[in-house]
Amino acid sequence: MIIMGLDPGIAACGYGIIHAKGTKLECLACGVLRTYSDESATKRLESIYQGVSNLISEFSPNTVAVESLFFAKNSKTAMKVGQAKGVLMLAAAHNNLEIFEYTPLQVKQGVCGYGSASKEQVQKMVKQILSLDKIPKPDDAADALAVSLCHSQAYRLRTRL
């Protein structure tokens, strides 16, 4: 199964694509889709949509996992991230992909085994689980891989029951 994990953001939207076959996990790609503040909001959202659509075409994921928006001190920022998340979900829906959402707590539990894990602990586990040479950069890419791993774990548990 190929899982595309997404960490929504308007300036940097992280993606992490893994291949999960049984207990074997392999990182196929990770990175960020960047937009720039001098672009209009519409152009930025279109860029995110196109970028995710291109990744879907290239990697043909079976499913998409998205990190849920938890909270933001700035409501304007929360709104922009929510718009980016909507565009990501639309791209997945246009490709008939099932979408799963995970909270940051669920991602930490799925990757590290406990919900109070630090960002650094999650990144180290992503590196270890996927047998990577180094922690993926930027953080948004590592976060997206963590979302993919969380879904892989949740899927394995669901299919065993």
Swiss-Prot record:
InterPro entries: RNaseH-like_sf, RNaseH_sf, X-over_junc_endoDNase_Mg_BS, X-over_junc_endoDNase_RuvC. Binds 2 Mg(2+) ion per subunit. One of its GO terms (molecular function) is DNA binding. Its EC number is 3.1.21.10. GO terms for biological process: DNA recombination; DNA repair. Mg(2+) 1 binds at residues 7, 140. It is found in: Cytoplasm. Signal peptide: none annotated. The active site is at residues 7, 67, 140. It catalyses: Endonucleolytic cleavage at a junction such as a reciprocal single-stranded crossover between two homologous DNA duplexes (Holliday junction). Keywords: Cytoplasm, DNA damage, DNA recombination, DNA repair, DNA-binding, Endonuclease, Hydrolase, Magnesium, Metal-binding, Nuclease. One of its GO terms (cellular component) is cytoplasm. It holds the Pfam family RuvC. It is an enzyme of class 3 (hydrolase). Its cofactor is Mg(2+). Mg(2+) 2 binds at residue 67. SUPFAM superfamilies: Ribonuclease H-like. Belongs to the RuvC family. The RuvA-RuvB-RuvC complex processes Holliday junction (HJ) DNA during genetic recombination and DNA repair. Endonuclease that resolves HJ intermediates. Cleaves cruciform DNA by making single-stranded nicks across the HJ at symmetrical positions within the homologous arms, yielding a 5'-phosphate and a 3'-hydroxyl group; requires a central core of homology in the junction. The consensus cleavage sequence is 5'-(A/T)TT(C/G)-3'. Cleavage occurs on the 3'-side of the TT dinucleotide at the point of strand exchange. Homodimer which binds Holliday junction (HJ) DNA. The HJ becomes 2-fold symmetrical on binding to RuvC with unstacked arms; it has a different conformation from HJ DNA in complex with RuvA. In the full resolvosome a probable DNA-RuvA(4)-RuvB(12)-RuvC(2) complex forms which resolves the HJ. PANTHER family: CROSSOVER JUNCTION ENDODEOXYRIBONUCLEASE RUVC. This is Crossover junction endodeoxyribonuclease RuvC. It comes from Natranaerobius thermophilus (strain ATCC BAA-1301 / DSM 18059 / JW/NM-WN-LF). The lineage of its organism: Bacteria, Bacillati, Bacillota, Clostridia, Natranaerobiales.
